[in-house]
């Protein structure tokens, strides 16, 4: 009996989605997190599997994600080995209508299977880390449940084959992001950051709503294959692409709609770790990857993506080198890498953008968890200038953050080298991409600068932290999650390059091919020389002005949050408040009627003086007016005589 491999892929993936959905409704008891693993050498693969132990100690979600992460590898390897085409399944027809049908349809292709495996492995590590990080939180189970729902919405967004379910996943990750950023509701900054994230994402949602409405209007369908097969008029097709670009820019924090991403670090470390690595911030890029047939032949759209991505990359890189908050540095590095993903979209290489998403997920999650470990161990200290010598008290965390920084810089044979350098090499094949690729190369140079800056201040510099800093690295929930991500960081680039990514043929010279690597080395040497000067208290003459510009994020927030808001408030005050509320509403509306009647009454009262002579005069004048009107009327009615 032959079993169709597509059936196996379909069964496993549907089972994963249903299991995640069902798990949200289980496990309602409130218990405290505990140490999950009996051994620190198992990378968390082997847990105590007793049901009572799992249930009573809040280990259900971690064990579930561990099982699903291992299970998700089977569809990926089956599709690679048997070269299975895309597997599409329609579960049922929802809201049937005569001229329009909405099918709940999923598409399990190589892109989704690759992303699913990466997302589940990374989320497994993050959730296990959460048991260490959220140890004293009063309500950890709801936090874990929200993380699962967050992941589930991202899986729905990446697997759906119609726009309606895509919209559900799209709005789901946005709403869950708001809940998780503002998890610590007593913090005003966390609440403000959550609102800021919602507002900026609302701008992006204008684009996705434009795309949805035009799709149903032009194509009378929300099915992606049908949309791809129908050609729209050029004008409407441009509007579709504009909507996609606005949506991706809002969700993936491209320049102009980026301020919410670094501000969102006010939430717990596991939140922005899962959001920056494998869920919300890559949703916009994955939207463009999934809808790549729409813009494959649109050179203008690709050019705009290239320009937007390169500006985002250089902006975030220049801002990161001036930050002192370790979480902000890693957050801006995420924005810079999102810019490189957008550059890959602009080069019409969506598969390479997905490749960078997958490799980026491992080392970025590891960097965030490592920074969380440092902050937790230093009593919530986040300033890298107050660190130094951390490898003495946190050797495992130190090794992981150094590995993540090297991977972020693009050191050979680490994942950043495989994916990031590939994007730059493809861009160098065509000099029409000159400006965008030059900015991307400069961003790569600065990436190595701020990556080495983290290493210098955290480990090479003399210790500056409190001598009473607690040592928390003996917790296996921390070490296993970090070590698992470190293993993924080391192996993911090589595995994905050889198994899932179809690398295009690149014909460039050896000098250009090594440009990214040379820039990385140059950046490290440059940062070493600058840090030595700063150590000797030698300040470059232009350091203050440059630092002020980059520290203040190119003054973008000063312009957008202060000037724009001031002028919008002024215009609203003059047009709306003064002209409408205090203008038409008061002078013509309810208050206007009262004022008019009051003025008429006051004018009439002037004639009521009580003098008999005045009354006789008014009566005589009234009589004369009546006589005059009567004579005029009689003369008009009498027949005319000829004289």
Swiss-Prot record:
Q: Which domain of life is it from?
A: Eukaryota
Q: What is its main location?
A: mitochondrion
**GO CC annotations?**
mitochondrial inner membrane
For this protein, the Enzyme Commission number is: 7.1.1.2
Q: How does it sit in the membrane?
A: Multi-pass membrane protein
Q: Which UniProt keywords apply?
A: Electron transport, Membrane, Mitochondrion, Mitochondrion inner membrane, NAD, Respiratory chain, Translocase, Transmembrane, Transmembrane helix, Transport, Ubiquinone
TM segment ranges: 7-27, 64-84, 114-134, 140-160, 163-183, 208-228, 230-250, 277-297, 301-321, 338-358, 398-418, 437-457, 486-506, 511-531, 555-575, 615-635
Give the catalytic activity: a ubiquinone + NADH + 5 H(+)(in) = a ubiquinol + NAD(+) + 4 H(+)(out)
Question: Which GO terms fall under biological process for this protein?
Answer: ATP synthesis coupled electron transport; electron transport coupled proton transport
User: Broadest EC class?
Assistant: translocase
Q: Which InterPro entries match?
A: NADH_DH_su5_C (IPR010934), NADHpl_OxRdtase_5_subgr (IPR018393), ND/Mrp_TM (IPR001750), NU5C-like (IPR003945), Proton_antipo_N (IPR001516)
GO function term, MF aspect, one: NADH dehydrogenase (ubiquinone) activity
Any Pfam family the entry gives:
NADH5_C
Question: Where is this protein localized, as stated in its record?
Answer: Mitochondrion inner membrane
Instruction: Name the protein family.
Output: Belongs to the complex I subunit 5 family.
**Described function:** Core subunit of the mitochondrial membrane respiratory chain NADH dehydrogenase (Complex I) that is believed to belong to the minimal assembly required for catalysis. Complex I functions in the transfer of electrons from NADH to the respiratory chain. The immediate electron acceptor for the enzyme is believed to be ubiquinone.
Protein name listed in UniProt? NADH-ubiquinone oxidoreductase chain 5
């Amino acid at each position: 009996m032959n079993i169709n491999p597509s059936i196996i892929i379909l069964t496993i993936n549907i089972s994963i989605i249903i299991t995640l959905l069902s798990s949200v409704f289980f496990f309602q008891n409130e218990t405290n997190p505990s140490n999950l693993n009996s051994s620190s050498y198992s990378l968390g693969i082997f847990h105590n599997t007793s049901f009572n132990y799992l249930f009573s100690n809040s280990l259900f979600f971690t064990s579930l994600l561990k099982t699903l992460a291992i299970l998700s590898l089977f569809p990926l390897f089956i599709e690679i080995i048997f070269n299975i085409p895309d597997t599409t399944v329609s579960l049922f027809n929802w809201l049937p209508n005569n001229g329009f049908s909405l099918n709940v349809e999923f598409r399990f292709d190589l892109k989704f299977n690759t992303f699913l495996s990466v997302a589940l492995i990374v989320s497994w590590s993050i959730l296990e880390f959460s048991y260490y990080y959220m140890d004293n939180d009063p309500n950890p189970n709801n936090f874990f449940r929200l993380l699962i729902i967050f992941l589930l919405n991202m899986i729905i967004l990446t697997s759906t084959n119609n726009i309606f379910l895509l919209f559900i996943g799209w709005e789901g990750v946005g709403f869950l992001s708001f809940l998780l950023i503002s998890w610590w509701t007593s913090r005003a900054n966390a609440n403000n950051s959550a609102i800021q994230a919602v507002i900026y994402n609302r701008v992006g949602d204008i684009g996705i709503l434009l795309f949805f409405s035009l799709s149903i209007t032009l194509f009378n369908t929300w099915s992606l294959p049908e949309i791809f097969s129908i050609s729209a008029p050029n004008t409407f097709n441009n509007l579709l692409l504009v909507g996609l670009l606005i949506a991706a820019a809002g969700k993936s924090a491209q320049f102009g709609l980026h301020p919410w991403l670094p501000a969102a670090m006010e939430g717990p470390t596991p939140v922005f770790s899962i959001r920056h690595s494998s869920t919300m911030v890559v949703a916009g890029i994955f939207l463009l990857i999934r809808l790549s047939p729409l813009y494959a032949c649109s050179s203008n759209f690709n050019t705009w993506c290239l320009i937007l991505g390169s500006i985002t990359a250089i902006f975030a890189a220049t801002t990161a080198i001036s930050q002192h908050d370790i979480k902000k540095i890693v957050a801006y590095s995420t924005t810079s890498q999102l810019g490189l993903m957008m550059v890959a979209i602009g080069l019409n290489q969506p598969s390479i953008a997905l490749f960078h998403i997958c490799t980026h997920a491992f080392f970025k999650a590891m960097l965030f968890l490592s920074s969380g470990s440092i902050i937790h161990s230093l009593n919530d200290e986040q300033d890298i200038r107050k660190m130094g010598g951390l490898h003495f008290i946190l050797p495992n965390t130190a090794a992981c953050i150094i590995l993540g920084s090297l991977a972020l810089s693009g050191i050979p044979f680490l994942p950043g080298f495989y994916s990031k350098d590939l994007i730059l090499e493809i861009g160098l094949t065509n000099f029409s991409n000159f400006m965008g690729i030059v900015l991307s190369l400069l961003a790569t140079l600065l990436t190595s600068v701020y990556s080495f800056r983290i290493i210098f201040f955290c480990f090479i510099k003399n210790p500056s932290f409190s001598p009473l800093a607690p040592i928390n690295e003996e917790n296996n929930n921390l070490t296993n999650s970090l070590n698992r991500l470190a293993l993924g960081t080391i192996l993911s680039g090589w595995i994905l390059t050889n198994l899932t990514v179809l690398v295009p043929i690149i014909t460039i010279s050896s000098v250009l091919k090594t440009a990214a690597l040379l820039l990385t080395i140059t950046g490290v040497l440059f940062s070493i020389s600058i840090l030595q000067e700063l150590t000797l208290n030698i300040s470059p003459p232009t350091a203050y002005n440059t630092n002020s510009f980059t520290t203040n994020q190119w003054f973008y927030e000063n312009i957008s949050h202060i000037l724009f808001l001031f002028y919008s408030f002024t215009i609203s005050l003059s047009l709306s408040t003064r002209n409408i509320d205090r203008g038409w509403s008061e002078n013509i509306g309810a208050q206007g009627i009262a004022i008019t009647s009051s003025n008429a009454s006051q004018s009439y009262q002037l004639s009521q003086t009580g003098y008999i002579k005045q009354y006789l005069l008014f009566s005589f004048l009234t009589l004369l007016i009546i006589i005059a009107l009567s004579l005029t009327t009689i003369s008009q009615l009498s027949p005319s005589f000829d004289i």
